[in-house]
Each structure stands twice: as C-alpha cells, then as structure tokens.
C-alpha cells in the first residue's frame, strides 16, 4: 500500500511540474498573438478591453422616442433591417437617417432598387439631394455589388437599400414570365451578406435594408407574416425594426399624417423589444415636436389633464395639435422643456443627451422649409 501511495504522490508532482508557469503562459500567448498579427494583419485579433472600436457608436434616427428605444440611435458599422406594410413610413424613416448623417458631414448613398425615390420629398425632410449618391440598378447582383464597393471604400457613412423585395436576380430578369426561380433571391441575399458583413464592420458604414412583408401559406396558428429574401438578413442584421401605421391623423375630414409605431424586434447593441411611437406628417416627415411632447408628458415635465396640457401650472393648449402649435410659437419655452426632458431621461440611463441632436433646433429648421403637396405621403 505504501508503494501505491508513493507512486501516486510522484505522479501528482510530475503533473504539477509539467504545467507551464503563469509567466510562461503569458509569453506563449504573446508569441502566438504576434504570429497571428504577422500572418493576418494588425487588428486580426485583440483583447476586447483594449479595442476602442469595439464600443459601438450611434447616430440619431430623427425621432427622439426611437433613439431612446434603440439605446441612442442607429449603430455605426452594423446592418439594420426596417420592414413593415405599405405606406407605414419605411422610406421616410431612412431618409431622416440620411439627413442626420449628412448634417454631421457624412456621405450617404441610396440604392433605389424600386426606382421610386422622390427627390422633392427627400429634400423637404432635410436630405442634401445634390450630394446624395443615388443608384438605380438593373439587377439584384448589380445592386449588392454596388453596396459592397461603397462599403469597401470606407468613404461612405450610410447606405440605404430600397428594397430587398426589388432585388431581382439576373436569372429571373433574363428569363420569361412564369419561369420558376425558387429560392434564387434567398441565395443571392445569403451570398451577399456573407461577403459584405465583415467589410461593414471594418469601414464603420451603416447599411439599412428596407423590406416588405409577405404572408406564409397554410399558417393556421401564429403570425403568418414574413419578410422577403430568405432568412440570411434576419441573422446578419444587428437591429430589426418593425414599423406599422396605427392611426391616421385628421383635421376634420382632411388627412395630414399618420401615427407610426416601431417595435425593435431585434437589437444586438441594446435591450430589444422596446416600442416607440411618433407622428409622420405628409410632406414634412417625422414630427420632432410631437416626439418632444410625448416624452415631456411621459416624464412629467408637461402635465395632461383631460384634453388640456399644462406646463409649470399654466395651460398651454387644448388637444395635442394645439399644444404642438404653441411649442412652435414659443421657442424659449420649447428649449426649456427639452432641457428638462433630457435631464429626466439621462438620469440612470446609458443614453447621453449629447448623443442626440437638439429637437428645438431641428423643429425650427423644419418649420422654415416649405411643405410639399399632400401627394407625397409617407412612403
């Protein structure tokens, strides 16, 4: 028995001696890290705490309520998918994103696969159409190749693709009407996402795909809705936004806008499943003052009793529309309310007030622009 004990102790001591010391492990790790960087380039592997670029930056969406739902705005260097029914505000939402990027000196591109971009409406939302890069590709392969080259250049800050449903494969265009092309668009999107996703992260360019809804056949239970282009985009997208029209805004019998509701269906950079609501006015886009009033009421800066809104004990308007008009006419009070709202929102929140453009300045800028005709509805 004593022999067995001695042999066990000796084997244990041998195993302890065989283990590398902490200093040797660090030396070996640094050696292999250096070898990887020499083989694949600097930055191919890193410690997460040492990489400043791993902190995801954001830029505003144009609606403060949506900025808060997203944790600050759209993430830079990520893929975003915006989907919803027709005339729910998808294109309007992305045009506001383009305007925000251009306002900060960035370069924007719009891949108009649907061939339906309205330059007059885009200009009314604040888009600098003279410096906006626009492409109207003939095929889906051409559109995605253009996106890939723009992303690789690292000179473009945002690319919008309108829409995935309009990215028609070349084989389908060259074929005849009625020819079956099962899964061709899904294969195209899957290949494209594999190719461009890595370059998107390296360049810091945000790529926003607009998508349409379809109904799955034979679904009895559950939601029958699905998006076009297969499942690849769902996996590669860091943020997915489901936008819906929940109300039509009217003055008497005249329709002047819609109430939109956005659900963050997926978010890899902030908590998901948050909901934001805002008004989209025909010819003017997202109502920044409407967003401010909603958040002022939610935070208690503005009190609503019945139909009346009050600020600091004084009634400022009866009904939502009259209160927004009062805010437009009283810029000083508007700025005071905005400051108070931001103070309330940033208490214990990761979203900083500096990460969002002041709404008062945005509202004054929008008020100076002439509204286009009501024919330019929310896309």
UniProtKB/Swiss-Prot annotation:
<dbReference type="GO" id="GO:0006281">
    <property type="term" value="P:DNA repair"/>
</dbReference>
<protein>
    <recommendedName>
        <fullName>Protein RecA</fullName>
    </recommendedName>
</protein>
<keyword id="KW-0233">DNA recombination</keyword>
<feature type="binding site">
    <location>
        <begin position="84"/>
        <end position="91"/>
    </location>
    <ligand>
        <name>ATP</name>
    </ligand>
</feature>
<keyword id="KW-0547">Nucleotide-binding</keyword>
<dbReference type="InterPro" id="IPR020584">
    <property type="entry name" value="DNA_recomb/repair_RecA_CS"/>
</dbReference>
<dbReference type="InterPro" id="IPR003593">
    <property type="entry name" value="AAA+_ATPase"/>
</dbReference>
<keyword id="KW-0238">DNA-binding</keyword>
<dbReference type="GO" id="GO:0005524">
    <property type="term" value="F:ATP binding"/>
</dbReference>
<dbReference type="GO" id="GO:0005829">
    <property type="term" value="C:cytosol"/>
</dbReference>
<keyword id="KW-0742">SOS response</keyword>
<dbReference type="GO" id="GO:0003697">
    <property type="term" value="F:single-stranded DNA binding"/>
</dbReference>
<dbReference type="Pfam" id="PF00154">
    <property type="entry name" value="RecA"/>
</dbReference>
<dbReference type="GO" id="GO:0006310">
    <property type="term" value="P:DNA recombination"/>
</dbReference>
<dbReference type="InterPro" id="IPR013765">
    <property type="entry name" value="DNA_recomb/repair_RecA"/>
</dbReference>
<comment type="function">
    <text>Can catalyze the hydrolysis of ATP in the presence of single-stranded DNA, the ATP-dependent uptake of single-stranded DNA by duplex DNA, and the ATP-dependent hybridization of homologous single-stranded DNAs. It interacts with LexA causing its activation and leading to its autocatalytic cleavage.</text>
</comment>
<dbReference type="InterPro" id="IPR023400">
    <property type="entry name" value="RecA_C_sf"/>
</dbReference>
<keyword id="KW-0227">DNA damage</keyword>
<comment type="similarity">
    <text>Belongs to the RecA family.</text>
</comment>
<dbReference type="GO" id="GO:0009432">
    <property type="term" value="P:SOS response"/>
</dbReference>
<feature type="region of interest" description="Disordered">
    <location>
        <begin position="1"/>
        <end position="24"/>
    </location>
</feature>
<dbReference type="InterPro" id="IPR027417">
    <property type="entry name" value="P-loop_NTPase"/>
</dbReference>
<dbReference type="GO" id="GO:0003684">
    <property type="term" value="F:damaged DNA binding"/>
</dbReference>
<dbReference type="InterPro" id="IPR049428">
    <property type="entry name" value="RecA-like_N"/>
</dbReference>
<dbReference type="InterPro" id="IPR020587">
    <property type="entry name" value="RecA_monomer-monomer_interface"/>
</dbReference>
<dbReference type="GO" id="GO:0016887">
    <property type="term" value="F:ATP hydrolysis activity"/>
</dbReference>
<keyword id="KW-0067">ATP-binding</keyword>
<dbReference type="GO" id="GO:0140664">
    <property type="term" value="F:ATP-dependent DNA damage sensor activity"/>
</dbReference>
<keyword id="KW-0963">Cytoplasm</keyword>
<dbReference type="Pfam" id="PF21096">
    <property type="entry name" value="RecA_C"/>
</dbReference>
<feature type="compositionally biased region" description="Polar residues">
    <location>
        <begin position="7"/>
        <end position="16"/>
    </location>
</feature>
<dbReference type="InterPro" id="IPR049261">
    <property type="entry name" value="RecA-like_C"/>
</dbReference>
<dbReference type="InterPro" id="IPR020588">
    <property type="entry name" value="RecA_ATP-bd"/>
</dbReference>
<keyword id="KW-0234">DNA repair</keyword>
């Amino acid at each position: 028995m004593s022999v067995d004990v001695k042999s066990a102790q000796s084997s244990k001591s041998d195993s302890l001696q065989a283990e590398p010391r902490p200093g040797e492990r660090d030396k070996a790790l640094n050696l292999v890290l250096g070898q990887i960087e020499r083989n694949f380039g600097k930055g191919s592997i890193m410690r997460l705490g040492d990489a400043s670029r791993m902190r995801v930056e954001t830029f505003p969406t144009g609606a403060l309520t949506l900025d808060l739902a997203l944790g600050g705005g759209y993430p830079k260097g990520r893929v975003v998918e915006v989907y919803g029914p027709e005339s729910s505000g998808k294109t309007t939402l992305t045009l506001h994103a383009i305007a925000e990027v251009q306002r900060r000196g960035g370069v924007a591109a719009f891949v108009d696969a649907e061939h339906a971009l309205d330059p007059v409406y885009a200009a009314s939302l604040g888009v600098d159409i003279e410096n906006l890069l626009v492409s109207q590709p003939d095929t889906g392969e051409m559109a995605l190749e253009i996106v890939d080259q723009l992303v690789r250049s690292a000179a473009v800050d945002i690319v919008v693709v309108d829409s995935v449903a309009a990215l028609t494969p070349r084989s389908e265009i060259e074929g005849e009407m009625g020819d079956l092309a099962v899964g061709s668009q899904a294969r195209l999107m899957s290949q494209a996402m594999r190719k461009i996703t890595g370059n998107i992260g390296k360049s810091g360019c945000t790529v926003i795909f607009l998508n349409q809804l379809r109904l799955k056949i034979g679904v009895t239970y559950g939601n029958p809705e699905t998006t076009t282009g297969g499942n690849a985009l769902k996996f590669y997208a860091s943020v997915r936004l489901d936008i819906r029209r929940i109300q039509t805004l009217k003055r008497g019998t005249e329709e002047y806008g819609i109430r939109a509701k956005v659900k963050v269906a997926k978010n890899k950079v902030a908590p998901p499943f948050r909901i934001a609501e805002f008004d989209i006015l025909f010819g003017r886009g997202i109502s920044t003052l409407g967003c401010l009033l909603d958040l002022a009421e939610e935070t208690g800066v503005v009190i609503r009793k019945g139909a009346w809104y009050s600020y600091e004990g004084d009634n400022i308007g009866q009904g939502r529309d009259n209160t927004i008009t009062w805010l437009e006419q009283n810029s000083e009070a508007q700025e005071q309310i905005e400051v108070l709202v931001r103070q309330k929102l940033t208490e214990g929140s990761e979203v900083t007030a500096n990460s969002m453009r002041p709404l008062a300045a945005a509202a004054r800028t929008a008020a100076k622009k002439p509204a286009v005709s009501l024919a330019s509805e929310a896309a």
